[in-house]
Amino acid sequence: MSYFDINDILAEEQKITCNFFYDAYNLGQLEEGSRDPDMKKGSKVDLPYWMALALAKSNFVSVIMPPEYQDEYKNKLIADPNVISMRLFPYYDKIGVQLSDFFGDRKLKLLLFRVFRERFLNIYSQSINLKETDISKILGNLTYQEREVFSNGYKSSNDYDKWMSRKGEKVEKNTNNLLISTSSNNKNNSSNSSNNNSNNNNNNNNNNNNNNNNNNNNNNNNSNSNSNSNSNSSNGNNNNNSQNSSYKNTQSTTVKKRKRMFDDE
């Protein structure tokens, strides 16, 4: 069971007859028409299923199988499940499964499965074949699970008939949607192409900037090499000049020495 499912909550509110094993103080209000504030031992009280199950597990009460799950009613279901009205037992199958687990009654569980299977086929067949009819009386004789089966089949059948009767209109609408989607795709493609062109232009500009940077670097390298060569040549010239001057000084010194020697003689 789901905690937030309204049908599960209502199913657990179904009344089940219980027999108290002990005196229960301050629980007399549970018994309808009783003025005694306490519940006497042996009292039979109709309690909600959730309360009866909790008290039975604690051995405070014994649960009495409801009449609709006893042999008389079960024999009617076995004879012809489709003619039985479930107006008074909207949660017959759900509570029946839980009671079969509580009492360990496997035969009851098998009977519930068989009844649901046979009624399901008849209910589904009616739901897809009934057209433009009042279904409130049919739904009133079903359990809440059977109502869901019938409602889903009935709605699906009517939706299919409406779709078949307006098939041309549906195709036209789909064509318009196709044209709209095509135009939107073209717009998207054009915008994408413009974005690609702008990206290509940006890439070209970046390449040009890189080329300019490379040219500037080459020019700088050439200027540096020229300056280095000029400085080297100037250094070489300076060295040559210094060598020439030293050679001249040496020659002049030699001439002076020889002149002195001649003068001394």
Curated annotation (Swiss-Prot):
Region ranges (Disordered): 180-265
Predominant cellular place of this UniProt entry's protein: nucleus
Disulfide bonds: none
Biased composition (Low complexity): 183-246
Biased composition (Basic residues): 255-265
Protein family (similarity comment): Belongs to the GINS3/PSF3 family.
Subunit field text: Component of the GINS complex which is a heterotetramer of gins1, gins2, gins3 and gins4.
Protein name, UniProt field: Probable DNA replication complex GINS protein PSF3
Source organism of the structure: Dictyostelium discoideum
Gene encoding the protein: gins3
